[in-house]
Amino acid sequence: MPDPSTYRPAPGSIPVEPGVYRFRDPHGRVIYVGKAKSLRSRLNSYFADLSGLAPRTRQMVMTAAKVEWTVVNTEVEALQLEYNWIKEFDPRFNIRYRDDKSYPVLAVTLNEEFPRLKVYRGPRKKGVRYFGPYSHAWAIRETVDLLTRVFPARTCSAGVFKRHNQIDRPCLLGYIDKCSAPCVGRVSAEQHRQIVLDFCDFLAGKTDRLVRDLERKMTAAAEDLDFERAARLRDDIGALRRALEKQTVVFGDGTDADVVAFADDDLEAAVQVFHVRGGRVRGQRGWIVEKSGEPGESGEGQLVEQFLTQFYGDQAELGSAGDNAGDSGQDEATNPVPRQVLVPCLPDNADELTEWLSQLRGSRVALRVPQRGDKKALFETVQRNAKEALAQHKLKRAGDFTARTAALQSIQDTLGLADAPLRIECIDISHVQGTDVVASLVVFEDGLPRKSDYRHYAIREAAGDGRSDDVASIAEVTRRRFYRHLHDTQHPTELSAEGKSRKFAYPPNLFVVDGGAPQVNAAQAVLDELGISDVAVIGLAKRLEEVWVPSGSDLGPEPIILPRNSEGLYLLQRVRDEAHRFAITYHRSKRSKRMTASALDSVRGLGEHRRKALVTHFGSVARLKEASVEEITAVPGIGVTTARAVLEALGVPQAAPADSDTAAAVIDDDQRRVTG
């Protein structure tokens, strides 16, 4: 472990200006990013007295081998640079947000001729309007199901829409009036777009106007003695009011705000955010924050600063990736940064943080602490949610941690390992009668799956042409995995090309293969060949769940039988089953690609884009096979020569054209390539 005195900057060499600093480990990986009003004052605090540092900070300083900094002009610039570096390097010692899954939003695809309503996760796209986020996808579907009674907008995929257009018959939603069925021309594109825009206006908070319009239409229908239409409009108004009841008014002045609250202990903090738009709670999100232990960083003010920086920085990136076009312009309901952000306390750099948030929003943002009235009442509700979330997380973690500790201890004791197997890797082979032979490698750390480290392999040497050798396949995968580890260990400079870690730099404590004695011995032979002696190898056989160890082991030649109620056996089963699942998933994907390979793949000069255009135009390869050359050339980018080559590849006999016809076809094909 590096000695901090070996990389401490010389006295007086650190500038006193504001800036951002990075600590790197011996391999050049960035392990911590921070900012400071005075770089000299902050960095000197890390080296003055190690015993006075928080345990996590002391570990960071002892792990690091280098510190570097960048001077900036203002604290706002420091805030932005710190955020960018944390996003780029994901330093292990910075505050991390766990359980920050991709929350679903309701997307309205206004960039399509017939806009669609759908549940969506991922980066924002141009011309699409977003509402949310919602805590669950079912909440979006429930909202859409309720509102499509009044706003019968399209919710189907492009494939379903095209199929019903071709058969000229609407889907079930069209028959029950929950879709206006633009696929069969029941409404025009302009009429359908207006339905969708009214839907967007309702979700954006423009509810009073829509309800008044419906009430006016209901009254007019009743006066015209059209009681059936009046009754339908009455039911529509009731549906809208039920939807509004689900979004209780919390701010009578119609404020747009995010309300942020924390609940914390010495190690972690729970964060809860309520999104209020138009005075109504439109969404809620929550995280568990691991506190870093950095001096002054674990206080509530620092938690507020760190959270707002990361949360709104991410939201602004999503928003800029999908700047809405034309009639889908961003409004108060969809702007990632609201007019007000209510927090439990103001951080020390509240002015700089407010300026940065205002820049993200494009107009003034107020950062406030609620003191009284509706805002104070809602803040207390959010805070209760945060306390409940932290309590539930600690209860769940305590149970999980106890079980995982018992499982790792059981495996250590059973196998006679010097240490608990904190990192377990498992490989499994999957194939069907020797075809598409693949392998998976899954990783568990501290008894939990680490999916970012998962790998899959296509078997190259030990299988192929209908033959398969599971033992040789195990040996091949083991060699490829540990050869990579040895290479990374012997060439550490290659790890820091971008300052980011390469996961295979870390070997497992326990290597598990799916199988019995032959598979275990094959894996152990590879490790012996590579000179690796600090990795334990076992096999887990499905029959009786026997644990096999390599031949010559001190544990004897017979398999080990763990008790059925053993936590250790349960963990090994989970690891083995996860490897099996991951291998089958990859095998099915590879087999599917092979089985769906089209005869069109062999047509020279016909790329993926034009192949897709052909199949889309005709609906299937079978219909394409029945088409004539003239019909095929109607597809943009397809000339006569290519059309004949397509039919030839599909086994359709072609009459030999006359020389003049051939020349004309070539010229025509060339012209199409140029103009297309």
Swiss-Prot record:
All copies of domain UVR, residue ranges: 208-243
Keyword hit for RNA-binding: no
GO molecular function, a single term: excinuclease ABC activity
GO cellular component: cytoplasm; excinuclease repair complex
BP-aspect Gene Ontology terms: nucleotide-excision repair; SOS response
Endoplasmic reticulum listed as a keyword: no
Keyword entries, A-Z: Cytoplasm, DNA damage, DNA excision, DNA repair, Excision nuclease, SOS response
CDD domains with a match to the protein in the record: GIY-YIG_UvrC_Cho
Gene3D superfamilies per UniProt: 5' to 3' exonuclease, C-terminal subdomain (1.10.150.20), GIY-YIG endonuclease (3.40.1440.10), UVR domain (4.10.860.10), UvrC, RNAse H endonuclease domain (3.30.420.340)
SUBUNIT field: Interacts with UvrB in an incision complex.
Family per similarity comment: Belongs to the UvrC family.
Function recorded in the entry: The UvrABC repair system catalyzes the recognition and processing of DNA lesions. UvrC both incises the 5' and 3' sides of the lesion. The N-terminal half is responsible for the 3' incision and the C-terminal half is responsible for the 5' incision.
Name of protein: UvrABC system protein C
Gene (name only): uvrC
